């Protein structure tokens, strides 16, 4: 099975401006992400960006770069433009690896592509990890996902879902029971689906939560979740996240 990785990267992050180029252990963050993608065995790895600074840095460490519009509202929209520009076929599998996930294991990238290949009836495959700490469950920067019994996503939210009606009022003594999952921002799609995604209007829930994957559920698409057996390392959304990631190195 062949797959490609596209890494969407922008400079103007709201919570941590310029984060794609922040230094982590002597390398820009985007380089760590790129190197993980290369180790996954992907047929090709491309960085998609609208920023000349990111392009220059990426080309300096040997990456292929596709320049895209600055008007995109999500990584999926940026990847869709890049896939068309690069001439990818509709049935090819693309893994969207966000440029702020420097600690994603290469095996997880490949596993996601394999999962989509095994599920012809789904639009997207994505990754989640069990939540084991109460602070993470209530962290608004962490995206939670509720699954059905076959590991299809029912809903995503920044809120702590599913809500424990009888237990969440006492957070200090709260014991998690394995029912809560954190969504990791990595997706696998077929190229043909990206064109379909762009034809859909953003839905109310997507706008409220600022979560692009809710558009897929709103329009009746299915997202199959790969549940990691162990906790995946954190992505970088804030200065605090950056310090935690630096500590890993």
Curated annotation (Swiss-Prot):
SUPFAM superfamilies: Nucleotide-diphospho-sugar transferases. GO terms for biological process: CMP-keto-3-deoxy-D-manno-octulosonic acid biosynthetic process; lipopolysaccharide biosynthetic process. Keywords: Cytoplasm, Lipopolysaccharide biosynthesis, Nucleotidyltransferase, Transferase. It comes from the Bacteria. Pathway: Nucleotide-sugar biosynthesis; CMP-3-deoxy-D-manno-octulosonate biosynthesis; CMP-3-deoxy-D-manno-octulosonate from 3-deoxy-D-manno-octulosonate and CTP: step 1/1; Bacterial outer membrane biogenesis; lipopolysaccharide biosynthesis. InterPro entries: Cytidylyl_trans, KdsB, Nucleotide-diphossugar_trans. Belongs to the KdsB family. PANTHER family: 3-DEOXY-MANNO-OCTULOSONATE CYTIDYLYLTRANSFERASE, 3-DEOXY-MANNO-OCTULOSONATE CYTIDYLYLTRANSFERASE, MITOCHONDRIAL. This is 3-deoxy-manno-octulosonate cytidylyltransferase. It comes from Coxiella burnetii (strain RSA 331 / Henzerling II).
């Amino acid at each position: 099975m062949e797959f490609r990785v596209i890494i969407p990267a922008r400079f103007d992050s709201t919570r941590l401006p310029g984060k794609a180029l922040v230094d982590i252990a002597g390398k820009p963050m985007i380089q760590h992400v790129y190197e993980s993608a290369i180790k996954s065995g992907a047929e090709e790895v491309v960085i998609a960006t609208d920023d000349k600074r990111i392009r220059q840095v990426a080309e300096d460490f040997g990456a292929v770069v596709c320049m895209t519009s600055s008007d995109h509202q999500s990584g999926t929209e940026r990847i869709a433009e890049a896939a068309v520009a690069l001439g990818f076929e509709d049935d090819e599998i693309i893994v969207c690896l966000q440029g702020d996930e420097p600690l994603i294991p290469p095996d997880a990238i490949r596993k996601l592509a394999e999962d989509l290949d095994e599920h012809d009836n789904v639009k997207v495959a994505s990754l989640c990890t069990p939540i084991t700490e109460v602070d993470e469950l209530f962290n608004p920067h962490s995206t939670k996902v509720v699954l059905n019994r076959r590991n299809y996503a029912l809903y995503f939210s920044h809120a702590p879902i599913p809500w424990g009606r009888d237990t969440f009022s006492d957070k200090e003594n709260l014991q998690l029971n394995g029912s809560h999952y954190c969504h990791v921002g990595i997706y696998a799609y077929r190229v043909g689906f990206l064109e379909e995604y762009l034809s859909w209007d953003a839905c109310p829930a997507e706008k409220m939560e600022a979560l692009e994957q809710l558009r897929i559920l709103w329009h009746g698409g299915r997202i199959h979740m790969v549940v990691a057996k162990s906790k995946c390392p954190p992505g970088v959304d804030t200065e605090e996240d950056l310090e935690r990631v630096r500590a890993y190195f």
